[in-house]
């Protein structure tokens, strides 16, 4: 059985928005972030400003997917990426031109789903990362980058 690391801190964990300059940076940051938030010994209060912003996207997720976000998140078929993507797309007005609010909601939903509760550990974070890669396109990453760079946090 693994034991808690002294610190599990990806390179963007304590970063600011200034550390994101390209679509590749955003992809890398989101990958690290999902891994970080799904790590069972993560102390979310230790997150830096960028990760705190990403964590706050759960509020956007509740606005788009409903106030019972945890239940909605638990009901998604994360192990069936295609079905999961199709269900999430039902909440998006225009899949090819997602708004910043919709993108934040998707990240917030993924955050809620990735959080490990109790001592249960699974590999859902892999499914979440695959779903993100499938649902987000190049324009979405640019919109998200612009939103992060202009956000006040």
Swiss-Prot record:
It comes from the Viruses. InterPro entries: Poxvirus_B14/B22/C16, Poxvirus_Bcl-2-like, Poxvirus_sf. It holds the Pfam family Poxv_Bcl-2-like. This is Protein OPG005.
